[in-house]
Regions:
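Short, structured segments at the rim of ligand-binding sites
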Residues: 1-179
Length: 179
């Protein structure tokens, strides 16, 4: 997961010595760590990562006059839900950097891989439920977040009279449901 890696990187200016981390398995939420790495570089970090390992050395923080932060893509599905449920006009200006999962939601795709975007599981499942249905995959790791996001999403769907089925790595969601 990117959160502990980002935390280590951003805390490393005060480290008394370098740290070498080995990573195992398939990485998840990789975009967030890359964003942390880029911001740290803008601020003076020489740290980098490669496949299977990250070497983190203490660094001197040198703040630039400004840092441009990317938009929070995970809020786009919320805007899409408001539009779908309440008939609000929605104009999306996506950028080349907009995540593949968000682009698949915008195109109303029947399958979405959330390996790098587990934050989208709940709004994506509702969009699929009120739309044509579909399958969310790559979300097995979301069971170990602040809550079990697969089970929490099922619970929330059921609270609104909708349903889905948990799979080993996500959800299968029937379409044409109404909250």
């Amino acid at each position: 997961s990117s959160q502990p890696l980002s935390a280590m990187l951003l805390a490393s200016p005060s480290f008394p010595f370098p740290v070498r981390l080995e990573t195992y398995g398939k990485g998840v939420s990789r975009g967030y760590f890359q964003m942390s790495l880029e911001i740290a570089k803008i601020c003076g970090s020489k740290n980098h990562s490669s496949s299977g390992e990250i070497n983190i050395v203490p660094w001197e923080v040198s703040l630039p006059d400004s840092i441009e932060m990317p938009t929070e893509d995970s809020l786009i599905p919320i805007a899409m839900l408001i539009s779908e449920l309440h008939g609000a006009k929605l104009e999306l200006n996506t950028e080349p950097s907009t995540s593949p999962a968000i682009n698949r939601l915008i195109k109303k795709s029947s399958s979405i891989d959330l390996r790098d975007e587990s934050d989208l599981i709940c709004p994506a499942s509702v969009l699929m439920a009120i739309g044509n249905g579909g399958k969310i995959s790559g979300a097995a790791h979301s069971r170990g977040k602040e809550s079990n996001r697969v089970e929490s999403t099922l619970y929330l769907l059921r609270c609104f009279g909708m349903d889905a089925k948990a799979t080993s790595d996500g959800l299968e969601i029937p379409g044409n449901q109404s909250p």
